[in-house]
Amino acid sequence: MNKNTLSTIDGAEISWFAPLCNGDDDFLGNRNPLYKSSWENTSSIVKTADQLGFKNVLCPSSYQVGQDPLSFVAGMSSQTEKINFLVAIRCGELHPPMLARTIASLDHMLKGRLTVNIISSNLPGTDLSSKERYARSREVIQILKQSWTQDQIRFKGKYYDFNLSSRPVKPYQQNGGPLLYFGGYSPDGVDLCAEFCDVYLMWPETKPKLRGLMDTMTNKAANYNRTVKFGLRVHVIVRETEQEAREYADQ
């Protein structure tokens, strides 16, 4: 069985983005029908990223538009060779034991090339507070980990109460399951990541702000005898010269 995918990374993991939600537009916020998200366009992008040597590709989730990330990743499993898939999972959207089964099945299809992005946003028609959503995500993660590492799920919390067999819901990665990525700045989210997740995702900030976030996460993870890696999601504009890139960015 494959070892945890993070252990095989040399230096930084350079990843790409699959436009599963609103499409692949020229400018942020634009909704050009020509670039509407589709299987044909998005699968082509991912196959190109695989051929170019990118380490991972984020497959985001949307509950209003776009394609289903789990189905998309399943379809791409036989069409790619090396690239990992970072599939976004919105906690509470799927029944946790069945979600564990789906992720384990995907991990076998990909032979360990699967990572999971934990999302805690609200679902349409619900209105949970941030604290409640992170509490629910905490329960979902614990159930997933039990499903992947034990033969019986025994869990009782505020949102879920299970006592059922988890055989043979075991992922290809026999070291606790796929790596968990997480992004969020609230205290509850930071603590959740420190205790359970493997990679903390951040957005463009000043260097002092990023350093502060990393120091906070490192210290909190140490309280759980854990270490957490870090990721940064940015939009990159590439042109032949810096001047051309800056001019395009100003449009």
Locate predicted features.
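Hydrophobic faces of well-ordered beta-strands that scaffold small-molecule active sites
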Residues: A12-A18, V57-C59, N84-I89, L114-I118, ...
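Flexible, glycine-rich active-site loops centered on histidine and acidic residues
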Residues: N2-Y35, E93-Y159, P204-T218, T227-K229, ...
